[in-house]
Amino acid sequence: AVRSGYDMDIIPSDLATYGKDAKALLKELQRDMDTAILLITHNLGVVWEMCDKVMVMYAGNTVEFTDTKTLYSNPRHPYTWGLLDSMPKLSDESKGELKTIPGTPPDLRLTGKCCNFYNRCPYVTEACTQSVPPLVEVEPGHFVACHRQNLTNKLEKGEGLKDE
């Protein structure tokens, strides 16, 4: 039905079926209709295979937005690091245990007044508990919402702040 008459600018999908057939069908529809796919998923492997650009969201807020290659090679938000670190790896010696992000998700009824990730973030500051960080372009086409990005230092994964 989609191919035979609907004019869509975006095809929304949660990719409930992760099989090759679902991915192939979405790619075919995208090509045939010259349109975009809005893919909503927690499966970062699917993101790598299917997406040109990625918007990472946490508790309803965008925390990072960039092209897929940059996200995987230079993630800049602590939540993104946690997501990428939680992906199973062939070289992983965790003996089947997946890494997790410490802490608990926020109460969504109380969001909007601070960074939603502050209680799970190893780099939390007082600013994080006082206001929602703005989405800032930290490199051309790479946007991050983190109070630590507003400093003159570059936040490095797992190493704290480094002087530029």
How should these model regions be labeled?
Residues 67-164:
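Charged, flexible cofactor/metal-binding loops and thiol motifs
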Residues 7, 47, 105:
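Gly/Ser/Thr-rich beta-alpha loop segments that engage phosphate groups in nucleotides
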